[in-house]
């Protein structure tokens, strides 16, 4: 485990030494420490404990963990006895760390398919096995980073065209949930990547007719990824932002729509942008719990607003997040997390002299029954646009359906 200054680099894979280190996101924003991942088991535990999270990031970490696992096994074991069947079994085990996020499953199954195309299950893992896994994983990382910048540009284009069609001028705000930035991906991010790009390229100082003035990250209970991670990234980038509780979204939108100040800003909310852990064929989207709630809030305000004052609900994700095998959201398996994530809070004790070690504090009646789904499913009917790395953002046709296969 290593410590260093504030950073947004969630994944460090050294292509020369074949070593993998991940930023322990449970410690952010109060500490920056990296954990060494030397095996598939290490990755499973880190993903399960949410030391690394975000659908693209866990897929990349999962793939790289197979790389270092095979590399270390070949380097350290004199008598080679590990079979391809053993490796495939370990890969299937890795998938179970986070079942809702399709990216991890897709990456692992892609690797399995590539391996089984070249080897039989009773053959031994060898250097060629490593080469196959390495080449796939490096390409996965590089493609994800490139695609995230494309998502940012495509999201910017959709936002500009939307505001032009509404004849909107002046400052506007965006709401987001969970963490979808550099910490959740190879870099830049998806939903937060769009926010980064929009803030950089739509500037009042540059003479634009409209500009992003403020971002409102929802805290994202019960794991507080918005409060811990998204605020960390927004602060790092110098993007003006105000943290709100998940239950404040309706009041926030209503207050700003009446040109009343929230802190120092009156810029109305024009967009809600969320990421995705799984998008199925019809556009139904599984994302962090609370996303569905935000879409219904937007729908409520839109039903009472003039067309030029509506709020667009945007999903941002790479195409690797799309699951064409599942037709509707009813087929998505929703992961349930441990009850103590809801009944306790974990964090460092803060004093005038600095930060003390992390402690756990109870906040609910001992023994109370708990339902703690990690994700919910937003129906495609409530989504205005799905932004991927494809040039054209996906909007619904006249029948209200997405065609994601185009």
From Swiss-Prot:
GO MF terms, alphabetically ordered: S-methyl-5-thioribose-1-phosphate isomerase activity
One cellular component (GO) term of this entry: cytoplasm
NAD as UniProt keyword: no
UniProt enzyme class: isomerase
UniProt keywords, alphabetically: Amino-acid biosynthesis, Cytoplasm, Isomerase, Methionine biosynthesis, Nucleus
InterPro entries (alphabetical): IF-2B-related, IF-M1Pi, IF_2B-like_C, Initiation_fac_2B_a/b/d, M1Pi_N, NagB/RpiA_transferase-like
Annotated site, Transition state stabilizer, chain positions: 178
EC number: 5.3.1.23
Record: active site: 277 (proton donor)
Record field: catalytic activity: 5-(methylsulfanyl)-alpha-D-ribose 1-phosphate = 5-(methylsulfanyl)-D-ribulose 1-phosphate
Keyword Translocase: no
Biochemical pathway: Amino-acid biosynthesis; L-methionine biosynthesis via salvage pathway; L-methionine from S-methyl-5-thio-alpha-D-ribose 1-phosphate: step 1/6
Pfam family name, one: IF-2B
Any one biological process term the GO annotation gives: L-methionine salvage from methylthioadenosine
Main location: cytoplasm
Location(s), subcellular: Cytoplasm; Nucleus
Function, in words: Catalyzes the interconversion of methylthioribose-1-phosphate (MTR-1-P) into methylthioribulose-1-phosphate (MTRu-1-P).
Family named by the database record: Belongs to the eIF-2B alpha/beta/delta subunits family. MtnA subfamily.
NCBIfam families for the chain: eIF-2B_rel, PRK05720.1, salvage_mtnA
Protein name: Methylthioribose-1-phosphate isomerase
Organism: Debaryomyces hansenii (strain ATCC 36239 / CBS 767 / BCRC 21394 / JCM 1990 / NBRC 0083 / IGC 2968) (Yeast)
